[in-house]
Amino acid sequence: MIILAVGIGFGFFVALLSLLAIKAGFGSGYNSLVSVSSFDKRITLATFILLAGPSEDIFFIGFVQNTLTPSLGWGAIIIYLLLFIAYHYANVISGAETKKEFLGTLPIRLMASLLLSLSFYLTRSLLYGLIVHNLIDTLSYVALLYSARQKPTQISSQ
């Protein structure tokens, strides 16, 4: 239960950092997520909640880390972290983030993924990680939406 409490606190911390980063001009490649209809925003939010975090956690932690843990022990966590960060580098390739933005968010991504990985390693349950991952993704998206409401002319002009 302590893992969940730490994770929830961390989720709110990441959302606050996301809001500050967006206000500072980082993540402009994500503007397409907010410059759409209300229906599209709801679909995006549902995708974060139902697909993004859960599919990442099921594959990277539930399959990769779980498969490697018997032979590598804690080393499986390191492999998971490397794969998870490499996977998120797709944000740079797709143009959603610059390399500078990716590197700027790397410490937070590492801390979040370490928390998710450790929660599974210690509890043998994906539930805590799924809750925390969804919270981080959802609150970060809400921060993006909130920031867009504060500056509607900047978002719509890009």
Predicted features and spans:
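Membrane-water interface of transmembrane alpha-helices
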Residues: F12-G27, Y87-A90
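Transmembrane helix-loop-helix hairpins at the membrane interface
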Residues: S38-Q158
